[in-house]
């Protein structure tokens, strides 16, 4: 069996790891360190570590791989292939050179578009109608190696980061399973990326999460679904942050300053943008409160909202 080092961290990576465990010999798993989670800051292992522990696989968790003791230990292993999927760190050249068959990455975009750490978020924020999975050889430069295989998938109007993450996670494992035989046998024909067509999806920053109501409704809608269910787009109402998990676009002929609540229905809070498409907030969370449907919030506040300004 092919001896593989797997490197990954979040839920996206777990389906790939499960497939590799079933089909090959995973001799080591490298993931990020445990992190404090929640209000009580409970130290929590990353999803990939939980899978590795279930199968009693050796786990390495360097804070930074370059120059680490864990790297020195990995370099002593007899390995055929390194597979990464959303690991979260660049690999040192010494590690890239270690496996006999090279190092490959499962990336959640149609490269060269959306290189970087947040390709699913950015594709939805940009209003793309499709994205996909790329299996590529790894090089020193971020997400720039030769493409081995790709498969596209449609982004539906009602998709958000959560739904696309789940679809792409399954697609990534399936495409890798199809692609691995040609990599192992040395029969694949990889294709260089066209760097002139490269775009980048940097990790989401806090300032990327705030909604600018002065944009067209479609852009606001795409931002909301491109950040849901994490890290979540937000606005401010009455000096209180308001997270928006779900919304829809509605046509309006009411002319109002962008960010103004122009109407409420039984199920939504309708907010003006800078064009004739308003945003209907359906699922929300006020700071310090539990997440709730707008319908539940409106049962006690419907008559007091129209005319308020979100900023």
UniProtKB/Swiss-Prot annotation:
GO terms for molecular function: methionyl-tRNA formyltransferase activity. It catalyses: L-methionyl-tRNA(fMet) + (6R)-10-formyltetrahydrofolate = N-formyl-L-methionyl-tRNA(fMet) + (6S)-5,6,7,8-tetrahydrofolate + H(+). Pfam families: Formyl_trans_C, Formyl_trans_N. InterPro entries: Fmt, Formyl_trans_C, Formyl_trans_C_sf, Formyl_transf_N, Formyl_transf_N_sf, Formyl_transferase-like_C_sf, GART_AS, Met-tRNA-FMT_C. Keywords: Protein biosynthesis, Transferase. Its EC number is 2.1.2.9. (6S)-5,6,7,8-tetrahydrofolate binds at residues 109-112. One of its GO terms (cellular component) is cytosol. Gene3D superfamilies: Formyl transferase, C-terminal domain, Formyl transferase, N-terminal domain. Belongs to the Fmt family. Attaches a formyl group to the free amino group of methionyl-tRNA(fMet). The formyl group appears to play a dual role in the initiator identity of N-formylmethionyl-tRNA by promoting its recognition by IF2 and preventing the misappropriation of this tRNA by the elongation apparatus. NCBIfam families: fmt (TIGR00460). This is Methionyl-tRNA formyltransferase. It comes from Staphylococcus aureus (strain MSSA476). The lineage of its organism: Bacteria, Bacillati, Bacillota, Bacilli, Bacillales. The gene is fmt.
């Amino acid at each position: 069996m092919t001896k593989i080092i797997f490197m990954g961290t979040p839920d996206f990576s777990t389906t790939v790891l499960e497939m590799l465990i079933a089909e090959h010999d995973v001799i080591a798993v490298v993931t990020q360190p445990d992190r404090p989670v929640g209000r009580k800051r409970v130290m929590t292992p990353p999803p990939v570590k939980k899978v590795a522990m279930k199968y009693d696989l050796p786990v390495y968790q360097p804070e930074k791989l370059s120059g680490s003791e864990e790297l020195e230990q990995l370099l002593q292993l007899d390995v055929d292939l390194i597979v990464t999927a959303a690991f979260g760190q660049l690999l040192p050249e010494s590690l890239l050179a270690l496996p006999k068959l090279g190092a490959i990455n499962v990336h959640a975009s149609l490269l060269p578009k959306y290189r970087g750490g947040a390709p699913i978020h950015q594709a939805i924020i940009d209003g793309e109608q499709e994205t996909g999975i790329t299996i590529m050889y790894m090089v020193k430069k971020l997400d720039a190696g030769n493409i081995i295989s790709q498969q596209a998938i449609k982004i539906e109007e009602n998709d958000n980061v959560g739904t696309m993450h789940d679809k792409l996670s399954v697609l990534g494992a399936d495409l890798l399973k199809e692609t691995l035989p040609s990599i192992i046998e040395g029969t694949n024909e990889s294709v260089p990326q066209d760097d002139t067509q490269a775009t980048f999806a940097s990790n989401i920053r806090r300032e990327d999460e705030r909604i600018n109501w002065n944009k067209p409704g479609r852009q606001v809608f795409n931002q909301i679904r491109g950040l849901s269910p994490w890290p979540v787009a937000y606005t401010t109402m009455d000096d209180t942050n308001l997270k928006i998990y779900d919304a829809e676009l509605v046509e309006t002929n009411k002319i109002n300053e962008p960010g103004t609540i122009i109407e409420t229905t039984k199920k939504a809070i309708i907010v003006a943008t800078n064009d004739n498409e308003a945003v209907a907030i359906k699922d929300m969370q006020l700071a310090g409160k539990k997440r709730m449907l707008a319908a539940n919030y409106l049962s006690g506040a419907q008559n007091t909202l129209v005319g308020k300004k979100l900023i």
